[in-house]
Structures are given as C-alpha cells and as structure tokens.
Amino acid sequence: MMLLTELGAATSIFLIAHIIISTLISKTTGRHLPPGPRGWPVIGALPLLGAMPHVSLAKMAKKYGAIMYLKVGTCGMAVASTPDAAKAFLKTLDINFSNRPPNAGATHLAYNAQDMVFAHYGPRWKLLRKLSNLHMLGGKALENWANVRANELGHMLKSMSDMSREGQRVVVAEMLTFAMANMIGQVMLSKRVFVDKGVEVNEFKDMVVELMTIAGYFNIGDFIPCLAWMDLQGIEKRMKRLHKKFDALLTKMFDEHKATTYERKGKPDFLDVVMENGDNSEGERLSTTNIKALLLNLFTAGTDTSSSAIEWALAEMMKNPAILKKAQAEMDQVIGRNRRLLESDIPNLPYLRAICKETFRKHPSTPLNLPRISNEPCIVDGYYIPKNTRLSVNIWAIGRDPQVWENPLEFNPERFLSGRNSKIDPRGNDFELIPFGAGRRICAGTRMGIVMVEYILGTLVHSFDWKLPSEVIELNMEEAFGLALQKAVPLEAMVTPRLQLDVYVP
C-alpha cells in the first residue's frame, strides 16, 4: 500500500520524464519476448508487485506462464516460476546469469558490493568464496567446528530449561539468534559475541531483520535510476543509517580481534586465516573493507535464514501436533531420553529430515532468490531475453505449484518419505526444491544451513514439548516479505523438558 501511494504521488514526475527516458530504453522490436503484464508508462509493472511481490508474481505466472517478462521501471525483468524454467536459467545459462544487478542494497549495505553476496563474478568473488568454503562453510571445515555447535546448543538447552522452570515463555527468534551468532562468532573470532540474552542481542536481531527486510524491497531508485536521488520511499536513508550501525559493530570486532592475535598463536580462527591468505595468483588481495563485508554476510545470512527456517518449522509442528509427536517418537526410538541428539544421529532420523525439506519447500528463506542479471542476450524456451535483464526465480511459487506438489498448501513431511520425492535433495540439483538457489551463485552456506536447521530443530523437538502461551487462541502464520521470509508475528512458546534432567546441564 505504501509503495502504491508513493508511486501515485510521483506519477507526474514520471510522466514528465517519460519522453527523455524512453529514448534511452533499448528496443526489442521484432523479438519474441516472454509474455507478461503491460504495466504503465515509465513505472511499468512496479505497482503490480504490491507488498508481497513473491505472491503477486506467483499469481501472474498462472496467467502468463512459467517464464514472464516485466518492464519494471526502465529495467527488464524475467521471472522463472517452475522447476524447468529455473533449470534453464540457473543451470543451462548459469554463466550468462552469474552477476548481480546494481542496487541500493549492494551500494549502501554491502560496502559498495565489496562482499561475497553482491560482488561481481570475478577473481575477488572467487577468492572470498574459496576462503569461506575451505575454512568455514565446506564439508571438512564444517566438521571441524561441530563441537562449537554442540557446546552452544548445550547453553541454549540450559537457558530454556531454566525459563521453563520459571514459567517464562521462549521467544524463538531471539533464542536462535543468540545461539547462532555465538556459534559463528566462535568460529570467526574465537569468542562468543553475546554473553547474556538481553538488550544487546535484541538490538542485533532487530538490525539483522531490518537489513533482510529493506534489502528485499523493490526500491524505485533501482528500477528508475534517474529518480534514485529523490529516495521516494526513504529506503536509502534507512540503509545508510543501518550501515553505520553494522560498520561500527564490525569495526569493533575487527579491531579487538587484531589486538588479541598473540593469544591465538597456533590456533588461528577464520578471520586469522582470511587475513593471512587474502590474496590469490591473479593478483587479487582482500582489503579490510572486503573482510568486514564478508563478516557482515556470514553473521547476517548465517543467523537469519537458518533461524527463520527453524521458526517456521516449529510453528508448523505446533499447528499440526501430530507431526510434532511423530517426530518425537522417531527420536525416542533412535536416541532415547537419556541423552541429547547428536549430529551423527541425523542420518537415522528420516522423518526429521522430511520435516526440514517440507519447511524449505513451503517457507523458503529467500522467496525470490537473490536477483541476477544477463551478461548477454540469450534465448530461453524460444523466448528472447535481452542483455541486462534482471532475473528473479520465484522459489516460493515453485514450492507451492500444484503441478509439482500434491496439496501444496498442506504441511506434509510424508511427501518426502517415499517415491521419487524421497530422493529430492535441497542442495541445488533438484529444481523442485532449491531453497538455497542453484548454479555458481548458489548460497555459499548451503551445507551449513542444512546442518544447522536439521541439528538445531531436531535438538529442540527432542528436548522439549511445545505449546502456545495460554492467551494465544490461534497461531498466526502470516509472512513478512523481505530478502528472507520472516514470520509476521514472531513465534513465542511455552516449553517443557522431556529428557532426564542431567541432559540440560552443559
């Protein structure tokens, strides 16, 4: 609604600028573009996106098909809404769509795209990706900090047990942010970044949520560059203010870490390794800005996307108690009630893994994936896609497509336990389920995300019974759109320990 109001107020400005701008728009006369809505002069389809663009685009796809083309402001945008369409763009034409389009988020939040998420596909991006995979996110590196995850979960279980004894409710997002930020902090900086839950961790969570929210907005200035200076929605002002907060926090972490280098002699952490190996054979060397931008990526994406998936999964199980009970029964049979769940137990818990896949399907953390842009014109399924066309893959729509999934609005983990669906893997090769994207620009933290969701969710379900606070009549399952898909109303719950009491002592 706010976007429509702002667009309406600016219509006269757009129309005056139309004649000038239209001469700058590249023509595709005679080319067979994909179908799509016509939109308005200059502003194009921007008003059609509404407050929930992933939902609006899914509705449009029912009319226009698997591949759509929209004029959004002065920019062309292709939207893929089926597994085959996603595969065509992200696998067959992966290299042509390996870059990110310029946008205010990259400029004002990500240190002018000096990070890993928004960086140009080239030597610096490859170096950032290589270091992250080798020393934190990849298979062997991930195994090396399994004890950190286990220890931090021990602290979380103790805290939740204490809250249960005192009759306090658990705010799930706050609890998860505290634990996951401390996990990542220990790997990257050799320290827990938060000692106690309270104002500091809540401020950090609010900052992360705001970043993910405003970075996901369809910013008018990104699509009509000549109007960017006006900042009609106030988005860039918010981004700059938020960046100052994050930069102050990251600079403090960076400086404190440098001052204690001698204490880690012989036991380097992730930041030590990045600073020591921040160059490559192509002459690329990471600056302090690059390193801070990388820390920003890992802290924000590492805490928000996984915590969001876990929160959605718990909410679905509380709404469907039979699923919760079945998951607990599986764990009781495999693990018992006299010890905690271990990461090594997870391969023996197919129902838990099915719950995680079903959550990735119905509530993907990034509903529209991160946008890409075409380096050259290309043909997709017979349609012409011009150079510099932005690409959005509607992961949310794919997960709710009745042509792909039976009863897609139903939360049903059973669908992943038998038949072809039991072989579907969320790591980017099965395009029916691509919560982390696919291709070269797939989320660098895919492995870590899956491990964190399965392990933390499994531990929470095994360790506690869950119910809503007494005054909550019905669980709110509405979404809040952003770069990551949050619950509109954060989940709060009353928990009761279900294992023997010494398990909750870290």
UniProtKB/Swiss-Prot annotation:
Any one GO biological process: anthocyanin-containing compound biosynthetic process
Record keywords, A-Z: Endoplasmic reticulum, Heme, Iron, Metal-binding, Microsome, Monooxygenase, NADP, Oxidoreductase
Function in brief: Catalyzes the 3'5'-hydroxylation of naringenin and eriodictyol to form 5,7,3,'4',5'-pentahydroxyflavanone and 3',5'-hydroxylation of dihydrokaempferol and dihydroquercetin to form dihydromyricetin.
One Pfam family in the UniProt entry: p450
Classification via CDD domains: CYP75
Pathway(s) this gene product operates in, as recorded in its UniProt entry: Pigment biosynthesis; anthocyanin biosynthesis
Name of the molecule in the record: Flavonoid 3',5'-hydroxylase 1
Catalytic activity: a 3',5'-unsubstituted flavanone + 2 reduced [NADPH--hemoprotein reductase] + 2 O2 = a 3',5'-dihydroxyflavanone + 2 oxidized [NADPH--hemoprotein reductase] + 2 H2O + 2 H(+)
Cofactor(s) listed in the protein's UniProt record: heme
Amino acids binding heme: C443
Lineage: Eukaryota, Viridiplantae, Streptophyta, Embryophyta, Tracheophyta
Gene3D superfamilies linked to this entry: Cytochrome P450
Chief subcellular location: other
InterPro entries tied to this protein: Cyt_P450 (IPR001128), Cyt_P450_CS (IPR017972), Cyt_P450_E_grp-I (IPR002401), Cyt_P450_sf (IPR036396)
